[in-house]
Amino acid sequence: MFRNQYDSDVTVWSPQGRLHQVEYAMEAVKLGTATVGLKNKDYAVLVALCKPTSELSDTQRKIIPIDDHLGISIAGLTADARVLSRYLRSECLNYKHSYDTTYPVSRLITNLGNKMQTTTQRYDRRPYGVGLLVAGYDERGPHIYQVTPSATFFNCKANSIGSRSQSARTYLEKNLNKFLDSSKDEIIRHGIRAILGTLPTDEQGKDAGQYDITVAIVGKDQPFTILSNKDSAKHVAIAKENDNDTPRNDDDDDRPSPPEEPAAGPRDPEVLVATEQRP
């Protein structure tokens, strides 16, 4: 994106009613590797593709446990995610200390959105350059939430964020009706198939053990758990065997946009796979 006279400060509106600094922060989410969140009637699953920033570095974790009933997966600036995860942990600990129960997921995400929103209307702050997928379980069942740098959050049935995540969303849209009645293992493998669709063609032929894919699950009688590398590789192998048509779309992915003049008119939110109305 080219700079213009309306993007010098996060509090400056353009004549089209846009906040360009907030939109630039949303572009940072597309720089991170893809991550997928989906759920059935009893479990919520996060699947993240981890890649090192260089050949000399190790991979950074993309799934962060918050509480026994909650965890997040990130795409974007890891440092910003670290600040937000610390805030979420503090909120969960304080709530459990005060009420001796776990923090309701919807209320926690609302408070997180309120915290992130303040950075979009103060001149001395900048928006958080990270997107979150939140998987949680409470008395209302499993939850998948998407939280954007604009402080907007959505209750989803399934979703994907990060680089090339459109391919994963295509898979999720096509198989959405299968998720609700799927088993615990099946919902994990659906997430893995979706994340494999974000890989370039030359990387899709690797053996199952060569993928650095992290899987986490939370649900009924299941605290938030990140699966071991051995268990993740086992699920990847089975998912690849049962899927001979991994979806991908190189022409419609979520890589960072090339430099261009922002189009006139308000910018609509990114289309989600599926959302749920909050009761």
Curated annotation (Swiss-Prot):
SMART domains associated with the record:
Proteasome_A_N
User: Mind telling me which Pfam families this protein's record contains?
Assistant: Proteasome, Proteasome_A_N
Q: Where in or outside the cell?
A: Cytoplasm; Nucleus
Q: How does it associate, per the subunit comment?
A: The 26S proteasome consists of a 20S proteasome core and two 19S regulatory subunits. The 20S proteasome core is composed of 28 subunits that are arranged in four stacked rings, resulting in a barrel-shaped structure. The two end rings are each formed by seven alpha subunits, and the two central rings are each formed by seven beta subunits. The catalytic chamber with the active sites is on the inside of the barrel. Interacts with PI31.
List the PANTHER family: PROTEASOME SUBUNIT ALPHA/BETA
Record's function text:
The proteasome is a multicatalytic proteinase complex which is characterized by its ability to cleave peptides with Arg, Phe, Tyr, Leu, and Glu adjacent to the leaving group at neutral or slightly basic pH. The proteasome has an ATP-dependent proteolytic activity.
Its recorded name reads: Proteasome subunit alpha type-1
Q: What is the lineage of its organism?
A: Eukaryota, Metazoa, Ecdysozoa, Arthropoda, Hexapoda
